[in-house]
Amino acid sequence: MANKREFPLDRTRNIGIMAHIDAGKTTTTERILYYTGKIHKIGETHEGASQMDWMPQEQERGITITSAATTAFWKDHRVNIIDTPGHVDFTIEVERSLRVLDGAITVLDAQSGVEPQTENVWRQATTYGVPRLVFVNKMDKIGADFDYSMTTLHDRLQANAHAVQMPIGAEDKFEGVIDLIEMKADLYDEDELGTKWDTVDVPDDYKEAAQKAHNDLIEAVADVDDGIMDKYLEGEEISNAELKAAIRKATINLEFYPVLAGSAFKNKGVQMLLDAVIDYLPSPLDVRPYHATDPDTGDAVELTAGDDKPFAALAFKVATDPFVGRLTYIRVYSGTLEAGSYVLNATKDNRERVGRLLQMHSNHREEIPEVFSGDIAAAIGLKNTTTGDSLTDVDHPLILESLDVPDPVIQVSIEPDSKEDQDKLDVGLQKLSEEDPTFKAETSPETGETLIAGMGELHLDIMVDRLKREFKVAAKVGEPQVAYRETFTKETSAQGKFVRQSGGKGQYGDVWIEFSPNEEGKGFEFENAIVGGVVPREYIPAVEQGLKEAMANGVLAGYPLIDVKAKLYDGSYHEVDSSEAAFKVAASMALKNASKSAGAVILEPIMHVEVVAPEEYLGDVMGQITARRGRVEGMEARGNAQLVNSMVPLAEMFGYATTLRSATQGRGTFTMTFDHYEAVPKSIQAEIIKKNGGGVATKD
């Protein structure tokens, strides 16, 4: 018998909580869980007891690494919450959670306003079309300034953000908030952990400011809503319900961002934030249709939410749970799924059985018989499903838009202490790379050592820590290395001829290939321009494969060759001696021969580095950037500090955190994200080739 849905779709919210590191995102989530009755004791992040941060590394470092999903209930609504990390090394976690959310809360620190990582996650949310509310948190903190935070939303994000609340007091005098729609004040009782508050008239000394803010809000809503504009111009009364409905519509259309105030740590304003989630953020029925593709015809299909439609879901995260093994987090877009039934992994075109279904609450779990359209849940039993795969009804295959996964930019070698550790390391690396697509492991063809690659030093630190802790691997870890690449800068043609005839069956493969640079990010493109069968059709795939394998090891210093076009235009074969293997070798010889005149260069990752430091340290900061081969792209004032925008090679950024700390007496901060690849200077290229012991001579 089919199970009954507990909450209708219009009373379901899938939301994420996103912010810059330390803006109080995890504490905000904690309080939401506390007030919705999910937990009975509040856990503080700085004590290492937070509910959502369940990995030991998170509790020790006080930061959120993986996006834990949990379900809470508020005023007859189901709210599925995903807590996302604020550190740039974990952008894949932010990306994958935004991909499956319908709305988000952006948490700001009331003293700092919009910070660099806030800008990154805001941009990502805009890319995925996620409606947002803003919660100006830490209103109790010294230096808290609601108006300044509002200014940063306008100046740094160009967001059409408007206050729907106004704080009463700030710093240690922060007492509560004024609702600018209802025009009432909510004052909190300090002793009741935020569970009790009084709704009273707006205090006299706030009446004038609140009335002005109320009028500003109506004008701002009128700008994005014709119905409100007409009433406003006619001087007609606008009811609170009409105002809220207009704000909801504009928020869902990404034309308006409501701003609220509070202090999660001091338990103030969180219930009003929950009310705003229900009032202004979309249900799965309100968002625009999801894009999918029919794998059989290639036609675009629009998916809309509904239990009566065929099942379609996206696997957005794979995690290994110490008790139940492999968990696959799924977001259901349409249809329903019962535990024990079969699904089609449309991405890989194979059937899998879902053993059990779990509703997750951070790291506690509750078994459920069925999931419905709009739900977020975890499935057990999916052995071959990885992040970004589409799971659908067996008879209705669909491929949903997947995730953008950036390439790793930094790598370290890891050497196990014993044969037993090598086995544990292999298992650990396989599981961790399944969980996190930006984490890669490979064996160096030159040295035979294992290399692990990721998005930054902290990312790799945490992965190594997990290998030691969860998989009990004893290993030595090398110094961080840059993940260089190689490419061609000139067009050239070369022959590759492989002939071996010494009695018995010989080997014969002969190709002429034209190589040319491809656009950045386009990767390798192969073109077959053979006419008249001078290279038989059955050997063409072997030529392409031979090139791919040779490119993986580069031509200068062993780094992968990227962004190259190859056109096979001539060659010859032998009736008896030709084989796929011979043509593979011939193709690799052509690549090697071409590399001498193709202007081969080594590419290095260039990072977008933003440094925020007080004005008096500006000279030192800019000097350090220049000394690290960096280019300063621009500066802007950030409150009483300066933000320096620059492009710096990753190779020069190791140890920068320590340098910046000492140069600014601990007051400077920086964020770093990968931007693009660029050719290294000639002198450095020669050093890299020498260090890696090899390469080919290149003609300029």
From Swiss-Prot:
It comes from the Bacteria. Its main location: cytoplasm. The keyword Iron does not apply. GO terms for cellular component: cytoplasm. It is found in: Cytoplasm. GTP binds at residues 19-26, 83-87, 137-140. SUPFAM superfamilies: EF-G C-terminal domain-like, P-loop containing nucleoside triphosphate hydrolases, Ribosomal protein S5 domain 2-like, Translation proteins. HAMAP family: EF_G_EF_2_B. This is Elongation factor G. The gene is fusA.
